Amino acid sequence: MAGMSQRPPSMYWCVGPEESAVCPERAMETLNGAGDTGGKPSTRGGDPAARSRRTEGIRAAYRRGDRGGARDLLEEACDQCASQLEKGQLLSIPAAYGDLEMVRYLLSKRLVELPTEPTDDNPAVVAAYFGHTAVVQELLESLPGPCSPQRLLNWMLALACQRGHLGVVKLLVLTHGADPESYAVRKNEFPVIVRLPLYAAIKSGNEDIAIFLLRHGAYFCSYILLDSPDPSKHLLRKYFIEASPLPSSYPGKTALRVKWSHLRLPWVDLDWLIDISCQITELDLSANCLATLPSVIPWGLINLRKLNLSDNHLGELPGVQSSDEIICSRLLEIDISSNKLSHLPPGFLHLSKLQKLTASKNCLEKLFEEENATNWIGLRKLQELDISDNKLTELPALFLHSFKSLNSLNVSRNNLKVFPDPWACPLKCCKASRNALECLPDKMAVFWKNHLKDVDFSENALKEVPLGLFQLDALMFLRLQGNQLAALPPQEKWTCRQLKTLDLSRNQLGKNEDGLKTKRIAFFTTRGRQRSGTEAASVLEFPAFLSESLEVLCLNDNHLDTVPPSVCLLKSLSELYLGNNPGLRELPPELGQLGNLWQLDTEDLTISNVPAEIQKEGPKAMLSYLRAQLRKAEKCKLMKMIIVGPPRQGKSTLLEILQTGRAPQVVHGEATIRTTKWELQRPAGSRAKVESVEFNVWDIGGPASMATVNQCFFTDKALYVVVWNLALGEEAVANLQFWLLNIEAKAPNAVVLVVGTHLDLIEAKFRVERIATLRAYVLALCRSPSGSRATGFPDITFKHLHEISCKSLEGQEGLRQLIFHVTCSMKDVGSTIGCQRLAGRLIPRSYLSLQEAVLAEQQRRSRDDDVQYLTDRQLEQLVEQTPDNDIKDYEDLQSAISFLIETGTLLHFPDTSHGLRNLYFLDPIWLSECLQRIFNIKGSRSVAKNGVIRAEDLRMLLVGTGFTQQTEEQYFQFLAKFEIALPVANDSYLLPHLLPSKPGLDTHGMRHPTANTIQRVFKMSFVPVGFWQRFIARMLISLAEMDLQLFENKKNTKSRNRKVTIYSFTGNQRNRCSTFRVKRNQTIYWQEGLLVTFDGGYLSVESSDVNWKKKKSGGMKIVCQSEVRDFSAMAFITDHVNSLIDQWFPALTATESDGTPLMEQYVPCPVCETAWAQHTDPSEKSEDVQYFDMEDCVLTAIERDFISCPRHPDLPVPLQELVPELFMTDFPARLFLENSKLEHSEDEGSVLGQGGSGTVIYRARYQGQPVAVKRFHIKKFKNFANVPADTMLRHLRATDAMKNFSEFRQEASMLHALQHPCIVALIGISIHPLCFALELAPLSSLNTVLSENARDSSFIPLGHMLTQKIAYQIASGLAYLHKKNIIFCDLKSDNILVWSLDVKEHINIKLSDYGISRQSFHEGALGVEGTPGYQAPEIRPRIVYDEKVDMFSYGMVLYELLSGQRPALGHHQLQIAKKLSKGIRPVLGQPEEVQFRRLQALMMECWDTKPEKRPLALSVVSQMKDPTFATFMYELCCGKQTAFFSSQGQEYTVVFWDGKEESRNYTVVNTEKGLMEVQRMCCPGMKVSCQLQVQRSLWTATEDQKIYIYTLKGMCPLNTPQQALDTPAVVTCFLAVPVIKKNSYLVLAGLADGLVAVFPVVRGTPKDSCSYLCSHTANRSKFSIADEDARQNPYPVKAMEVVNSGSEVWYSNGPGLLVIDCASLEICRRLEPYMAPSMVTSVVCSSEGRGEEVVWCLDDKANSLVMYHSTTYQLCARYFCGVPSPLRDMFPVRPLDTEPPAASHTANPKVPEGDSIADVSIMYSEELGTQILIHQESLTDYCSMSSYSSSPPRQAARSPSSLPSSPASSSSVPFSTDCEDSDMLHTPGAASDRSEHDLTPMDGETFSQHLQAVKILAVRDLIWVPRRGGDVIVIGLEKDSGAQRGRVIAVLKARELTPHGVLVDAAVVAKDTVVCTFENENTEWCLAVWRGWGAREFDIFYQSYEELGRLEACTRKRR
């Protein structure tokens, strides 16, 4: 402060209000009087008084507003100033008055320099003081470059903050880097708090500046909080708290998120938040300087969800005296990391909902203080715990074991010596690196087997690891580096099949026992290495299953001396680290097998068996070398040469000359193809490394008609020799075009030599010149004018041209040299051994052996006259039989096949997704002969009429070829692939070769040019091979469909007099859909053209050889004539042309290297054209007719509807007629939107999402209804109007516009054609603006909905019912599309829009976005790629695929529905595609975790790599109509057990007991989690007969007539029983009956001798007294049943049930039921549902529709279900359960008597109460099987159950009344007219049922046993009856016209359970889950878990697809 005392603070720092409004005058006075400036008086400028007068004059001028005068005075003053100091003082005057111009003048012209000391009169300081931002900017920019005057900047900043100049503050901080946290100080001064920018801003009340500073690096300090408490609080409350509405339980309140982080707050004042404490949901106080907190944080914040206290100085949190003070029970996340806590606050243990706790980087020595933690519940919901970077030495099990939901634990960087014992929780991630762990617990696999994925125990002191670590089934990442491991557990016991990364680096692997390195170590052996002595070899081996999953393996820094052999089998490895193993000197050749390995670390290794130069090239080269060694690769010099060219050009002669060196004597016949071998020796003087090259020569000839067939012999990596006749000159050059285009189309990038023959026919004297000319012509064909390669043609340069004379043999030697030289330079791209030259390439020995085997097979078949093709299975067998075969995987087999194709050994066409790809042709000659049959057909009417042949006639041509019915599909695919026969309908094919080259009659006579004609010309640089054939086939399909539409409309429409009606044609790949439809008069088509005439016009398409711009070209011309000027036919044709090019010939959409498009469209002006038609001289046409470029039309169409022609500007041409496809004139008028009724804005708030290709989807309203508008934006370029006509920019914009119009048209057409409830409907279209309106999805996309719902649950985030419905609706939409031959191609959750999440709604989703959908046109689809991860593996460039690609994507969408996650397999498209093709799929979880067994199985079926194995959408739809699909959750195998018991109440656990005495054990299964929580826990004792859990007690009865009572506490095992009771007989069943008194109940134990023991229990403890009820005594004394009556036999009590609201207990007594009155504990009534020898086995009480109780019972002999009304004891219904197909059975329910009968004390055995089941007869005969005859009023009176005769009687017995009264009545089952079909539909796969019963040889008795009901379960308001065969009958009670009836509403049967034996028991757990247990002959048990659906759920399920069916039908009718 010393510096301050010498001079008073400047006026700037007077922060009080009275001095703050300082004017420039006062400021200037102060500036002048502020003391000596330190400058000497100027010698020239006069005295200081004069200077003062000058400055005063300047100021006065500024004050008057006379800036001009002030500037003159300033300039004058400058002239008189000598020093910079004086000039600086002058500069401060205009700076003070904000005169920017004068400031610039002084700085630039007068070179005034700005001083950098922050004095009061510094111009920058003055400008900052007065807030002149522009002046400040100018002044600071005048400073020299490197200068950074920080003191000046800080002074100006503090000043501007105090004065309130936000603009200056922003400029200083953001542009010039002033530090908001620095004090403003001058030289030799100390900082003062008032000069801190934030302090100054707050003190002077400049709130906006204070906030700006706080957001840009300023912080609160204690002075600010003390001196300005209220402003500070105001700032914190106003700017650092965000609001959002609170949940509905707090109406009107807003939730507050307090974000006070990174403010360096020294404390938090209670006053800041006490009044809002109940609204705070998020409190972030991280990165402050807090050492204490107010007591309200966090314990008193009742709504707090998230708390972040990280990065402070907290030693503890506020204490609490009792748990009552902790009211923040809703807390979900706490972050308290980077503090100074020594233990976690005990209050945390009361936060029962806490999910995430981060406490890393503290000083924790204990987790919690045990002595302070009292009556805590524990963090049962905690999912993530991070306590890394602390000082913990142990983790107490006491606390950890309460973390029941923990899935992530991080205890890295502590001092743990022991890892805690595992406990029951779903732990997924465990990190414990950098501790002092010496051992690990061995029970990890018990609790975490199916959960733990990521484990890190690196950098510890582990000497061994337990086997359990490698038995974690879900384990993906295991890091054990930096330990002391010398061995791993034996690999044969590992089960970690999903392990991806294993890091074992920096261990002791390979060291022997003494710890010394030895030459031969005990740790590893390699194959073939023998060991001496008896030493047991301990080998590091990895299990075989890791080859599918392990990707990264680190073995570096160990003591290995060999690479473990099993490492070489890990074929998925991508990274392998072997460095720093000093003993490792060799790499095994087997490493070469690892095809995916890209990182091989051999750092510091001396590898002796790989040459050094190869090691330098890196891992790829090393692996290639090892692979070649391993596979005994040999150099191969065999290649394929294909000689082609027009007929009779001298091909065969040329070949003979090359082979023999002389001209042939015999002329060869016209064979289509000849094959021969030729070896070419190295010419003298060649430097090539190979001695010779061997060719498999295919000489392809034959008549010109066979030219299309010959393309099928063109393959990659072959040398093509195109032969032509020089003597024919230019004509022959033109003919070369066909061959060159063909070669490039079928074998892109092939090497082609063009050889001219007949050289001797050119005169010698003109020869050189003539040859040069002809060569130029050939090159002009293949190269563009700029010299670059022409698109569509092979890469031919002058080096590839040669001439030869076959007579004089001139040029033959040169040709040999050329062939040898070219061959030696050909590369083998994509080889398994690495890129190498083709000649002399290394080929695995096994490939060569396979080649020999294939050739031998081909010769054998030739001898036997057998078919010359192999199926894929036959080829695989051939591979397997080849000696020393090492071809193991699919990719290697493909490489071998490629080699066979490249060498001419095989022909194979892998570019279809299935079918043709499964055939391998051995002999091209044979194949050619087969195809020749087709070409031998003449266009006779008998077989092929108009070039179209019926499929059966085409099949007839197969007879005798060897193609069978099984391979006919492949044959047809082959014909279509090479355009030999193209499908034009389901049963007919077009044979293009039969079409005439010109129309058969004069078409010009039919065409009269009139004013009603428009034309379109397509100019193409080349016409691709197959273009016309495919175009005509598509046209024929479309025209046929058009006729069909007309025919249907005639039938359907009553009166429609329009000539052009709506025609929905979804054409081609791009699914364009023109509405053009006419009635054809004549259709004429030929090889390159088609003409259709109709009333009032015609349309024609033909090839045109137009020669515009004197450039080679072909193309097509379209003419459309219409008297009514409806030119929609033009749109119809152009749609087809564009789509065909898009899908099959995309090369045409490219440009030449000089930028000219390969294809251009022109539109001749119709006005000029009509005028020209009047002329007679055709030569004038080109000059007189204007050709509009399509680009001009498109660009004009964006702005207006007319285009002007330069030849008649006064007569504009309407674009709607010229380019009808752009204006959608072929669409019905009703589809065009009225723009006046469309309300939409394109601001950001209205954007719903981005479509493909830059389209944007907006929220809008049309006619008052919300809609989604998809807008196609055409790019705008700056100054586009000024762009010259012919520029690249114009072309780019036109291309973009064309693309937009094209995609708009395609998608709108597609949507218009589709009408289905699960597909988004088109509302209308608009051209200006270019958009269409769709239905608006209220809830956005499925992806968004899933991501919002997936946070809370691990699987099925939308719940099972909604998930089922959504999956069903997607499948239904797909089935509809596939029925329409449309392949969606881009199905994913983003393209599925959600309408409703209410399961009761009929429609929940709709499919959208058909941007890349394709129509398959009977030929499959080609091209388009969907979204990586969803896209099927077979979609690759140039591969033809079918609708099964959508089923693959559907599988991925199912994955999303089940997991809530996207199917992520990587970030790069190539990486994802590779993984998918290898069969790698996203990991979901075990079925018992996911709990939607059928949907998961369907998902896996859909994403099968082979398309033919995927289901059809239609079959998926029918599968999902079975309720089993939705209700079956999972099965769980439980091993050998002896008894099963379930829990009562809300618990999800079931218990198995096994063994007896010392080996007795129990297993606890949690059915909710699908998890065995306790596995075979030992609990010695006698065999358990019965068990009951009541509250916290478990009662178990054993076979030694004892009851043991155990107390249940947490996870504690059952050790010693709390109490033991004796009983007179073995207990067979228990029942707990609550009593009115609190905490007391009765336990009834039914005994084997018929007694019932009653134990009163108070507070969990049974009283000493126990009473017995004797059934025998009651029967005799009360019900007068004699002792000799069969009903008095000692029957065990099998079932007991509490009835009549707990006032009675009904229990079984043989065939009868006895009723106990709970009040008096006496038997008061007997009921007789059955007759002896039947025994009641199950009793259950449920409520019926009116809410009254009914009791159901079941017996073991008659197998019938009896229903009693509980209050009247009246028998109401009986149903026989032994019906094989009970679905939709009904039985009457007797109405109640008005008065209940008096209590019956007698029981007559002859006439039991109610309807007796006395008349049941069971008969068995050979013919009829088992028959059960029941004489009662049931609709299931007669059932024959023989293996095959069950159905007919069943159907006969069914009367119409057995069907539901209405299709959608409550809990009804939909039905079809055909009962049998309908049964098939609802019985879980009727076919599978049939197979289970009918196809197994089963005697009648076994069959009837399978139909025996096992138990009755009351599930919600339904009765479920499981039967021994494994199916479950579901029965509901329903009203029907006043009366009640029972009906079987479903039969559930899971075929998956068949192998598990018979159903033995069942139970309902937690009221909503049904568990059935199955036992097989080995006493192995399996649990089947079902969703316990009630009537409501079944109702929703059935209605969902009934309603969808109804809506589909309505849509069809509407159309």
From Swiss-Prot:
Changing residue 1034 to A: Abolishes phosphorylation of RAB7A. One of its GO terms (cellular component) is cytosol. Autophosphorylated. Autophosphorylation is inhibited in its dimeric state. Phosphorylated by protein kinase C isozymes PRKCA, PRKCB, PRKCG, PRKCE, PRKCZ and PRKCT at Thr-1061, Ser-1064, Ser-1074 and Thr-1075. Phosphorylation at these Ser-1064, Ser-1074 and Thr-1075 activates the kinase activity of LRRK1 to phosphorylate RAB7A. Its cofactor is Mg(2+); Mn(2+). Residues 844-1036 form the COR domain. ATP binds at residues 1248-1256, 1270. It is a peripheral membrane protein. Changing residue 651 to A: Loss of GTP/GDP-binding. LRR repeats lie at residues 279-300, 303-324, 330-351, 353-374, 381-402, 405-426, 427-447, 451-472, 474-495, 498-519, 549-570, 572-594, 596-617. The keyword Ribosomal protein does not apply. Changing residue 1409 to A: Abolishes phosphorylation of RAB7A. Residues 632-826 form the Roc domain. It is found in: Cytoplasm; Cell membrane. GO terms for biological process: bone resorption; intracellular signal transduction; osteoclast development; positive regulation of canonical Wnt signaling pathway; positive regulation of intracellular signal transduction. Activated by phosphorylation by PKC. Binds both GTP and GDP; binding of GTP stimulates kinase activity. Sterically autoinhibited in its dimeric state. This is Leucine-rich repeat serine/threonine-protein kinase 1. The lineage of its organism: Eukaryota, Metazoa, Chordata, Craniata, Vertebrata.
